[in-house]
């Protein structure tokens, strides 16, 4: 299943240069009820490896990282930024609840920084009132506010 962005199928040849995106997933049950899930997904995954002694760049090279060792600045680590599995991504839930099937994947917006990504995800989760909506599968906001812990919210499952 492909991602939809602004009503059209989103499948670029190259991964975009954005940091990540905010998404909405729609699930359906056998009775035709729709359930939503909101989240964020990074497009890049940074890893650090020891730099090659030859000075060559590895695949997915982003930049070299220097350290001050015994008063000398030595290029000793390389930061790699391979693309994440965002094309096949199906949400950060551990598993899809029984009886539900994924019916729609939508990109709501792209973000340039990690701070933007966290802010806009949190903003959307509060705006959509996810902790009180029984047709929403999000069970917490930012790891701080949990369904079932706030008066009047849905029960935590």
Stretches found by the model and what they are:
Residues 41-114:
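Conserved short loop/helix modules at catalytic or binding sites
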Residues 1-17, 103, 108-157:
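Boundary/linker segments flanking structured domains
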Residues 6, 19, 31, 38, ...:
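Feature targets compositionally biased, intrinsically disordered low-complexity regions
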Residues 1-51, 152-157:
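GIY-YIG nuclease catalytic motif and its immediate N-terminal context
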Residues 36, 47, 64, 136-138:
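Poly-acidic low-complexity segments
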């Amino acid at each position: 299943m492909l991602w939809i962005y602004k009503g059209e199928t989103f499948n670029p040849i190259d991964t975009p240069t954005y940091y990540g995106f905010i998404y909405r997933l729609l699930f359906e049950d056998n009775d035709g009820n729709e359930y939503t899930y909101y989240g964020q997904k990074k497009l890049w995954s940074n890893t650090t490896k020891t730099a090659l002694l030859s000075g060559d760049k590895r695949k997915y090279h982003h930049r070299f990282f220097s350290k001050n060792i015994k008063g000398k600045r030595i290029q000793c680590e390389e930061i790699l930024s391979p693309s994440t599995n965002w094309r096949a991504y199906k949400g950060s839930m551990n598993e899809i609840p029984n009886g539900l099937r994924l019916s729609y994947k939508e990109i709501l917006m792209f973000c340039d920084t990690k701070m933007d990504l966290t802010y806009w995800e949190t903003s959307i989760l509060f705006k959509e009132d996810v902790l009180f909506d029984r047709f929403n599968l999000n069970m917490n906001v930012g790891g701080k506010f949990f369904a079932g812990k706030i008066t009047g919210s849905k029960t935590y499952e």
